[in-house]
Amino acid sequence: MRTIESILADIDQLKAELDILRQSLDNVTIKEALEVEFLYESNRIEGNTLTLRETQLVINEGMTISGKSMREHLEAINHKEAILFIDDLVSQKVDLSEYVLKQIHGIVLYGIDRENAGVYRKLPVAIAGSKHLPPQPYLLQDLMDGYFQFYNQAKDHLHPVVLAAEMHERLVTIHPFIDGNGRTSRLIMNLILLQYGFPLAIIGGDYDSRMAYYDALEKVQTENNKEDFILLIAEKVLFALQRYINILSPERIKQLLNDSL
């Protein structure tokens, strides 16, 4: 198995190549396609049954899919709005904060659970199929204060991919909201990645990918072993970079990279 350090080295090399390509190529269409795939897979992890094509029709064409629930439609629409909000944050160089987190969660649950959208939970919760028991509600504010303190201290010295993975895992583990913690955590992870110029990291919603994701999280939560989770996220970022570059014209890539040397 590869080490985190070796994957991060490959990530840095590919990121440098992508930065060169972005100076000369329009990548808006690619970015939009990957955003649709991200929100499809993120919702799929949580049990949404819309297909990738149906998701695209709902968010881009405004269609209603027969046989699918209103909640599933709203989850897709809200996720798209959350990504647009994140894009605005990145373009305006707005840093992660408690206000930003609650805004993102509020968008995720908009029209689904108005009472709890953007609000820390007031009830204890248990996660089906997990040995991890999220903290009691009275502990949440102190834990979330520590969450943002960690971010502000770590953002200047951790590799961006490791930072994104840490903020993802820590938020899922604290589980501050009554619902939407997973989707919000994956959005926060990608907010950080986008802020540092990386493409969206997509975690698959198929059974094997979902189980690998849950198992890596469980290992952090029950054994305090972060290696598998950080490795998983790093591999997703590496794949995203490889895919992004490969989608672009091979000849144009070769020309641009040669010209930059």
Summary of predicted features, one role per range:
Residues M1-L261:
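FIC/Doc superfamily catalytic core
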